[in-house]
Amino acid sequence: MLRRVAIAAVLATLASGCAAQGSGPAVRPSAAARDPRTMAALLKIATVFNNDYDRGVYGPVWDRWDARSQAVITRADYIRRHTECPDSPQSVTVEDASPGPGGAWIVDYESGGVRLHDYWFYVGGRWVFDLVLSNPDSVKLYRLSPQQYVAELGCAH
């Protein structure tokens, strides 16, 4: 009888150890997939990037920024500001991409009848958007307090 109790205790201990391990992820998440370093991939990524912005899906937009741009405003503040004070939706058409200065790729697009240019870089296996080069006016706005930001854009808050 004592032997059965000892075996049951050992089995219970082993089972609880297995259960504890099972509570975590079975497989570790892999590193982010690398983007192909091609113009076609960049055009596709830039199109998704602009479509996400137009639909108000701001998190993935911020996630595509380079480190210098992400240092301008936190992800949470970026999402909050755009959710509370959204831009008017505009149809954006990504048109072309070409190599630019200093390793940049310049993506040309049209928004509301205006031709614009964004700067993208290939860093660490990913295409990243450079807000500082592409839209320095937004950088100035993001550095304002939330109250100043709302007042500057004239949106209701």
Language model features with spans:
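Bacterial N-terminal signal peptides that target proteins for export
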Residues: 1-6
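C-terminal motif of bacterial Sec signal peptides marking the signal peptidase cleavage site
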Residues: 14-17
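Bacterial signal peptide processing site
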Residues: 19-21
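Ser/Thr/Pro/Gly-rich low-complexity linker/stalk segments immediately outside membranes or between
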Residues: 23-31
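Short solvent-exposed beta->alpha transition segments
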Residues: 33-37, 43-51, 55-102
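Surface-exposed, charged secondary-structure patches
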Residues: 79-126, 131-138
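Low-complexity, intrinsically disordered terminal/linker segments enriched in charged
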Residues: 130-157
